[in-house]
Amino acid sequence: MTAASAPSRVALSLVLALAVASVAHAIDIGQIKVSRGDVAIERGGQTVPGAVGARLQTSDVIKTGTDGSVGITMSDNSLLSAGPNSVLSLDKYAFDATTNQGQFDSSLRKGSLSVVSGRIAKQSPDAMTVRTPTAILGVRGTEFAVSVDQ
């Protein structure tokens, strides 16, 4: 190995390590299936359109405008529907499709949200929660709706 190739290999190794780390961090956890009106996704300080087909990641914040609504399917088949003037944060999400084990924590900061629970909550009812500014809701059934006025 020549002296010039050693730094090149180190640099290449660092680039590959960073690429793998960024891919591992950006795991898709769900997808927008229905989008009407003004819908946006805030991710890492940037705002992107909440269009049909947009992939969602942990820590995404979905915002709907006065004419907006959004339908989301998570990888465990949970269905989320947010109405106008809603702010929904996907705080924590982990799902193993082999065992149906996982954890799904979200926060509704304002607006309305309807949920049909998927495989995570069916496997372990304590594993899915929705926080609001005044309460923490544990999913014990298969369907529920919540509204936050501000």
Sequence positions of predicted segments:
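Flexible, surface-exposed loop/linker segments and immediately adjacent secondary-structure boundaries
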Residues: 26-150
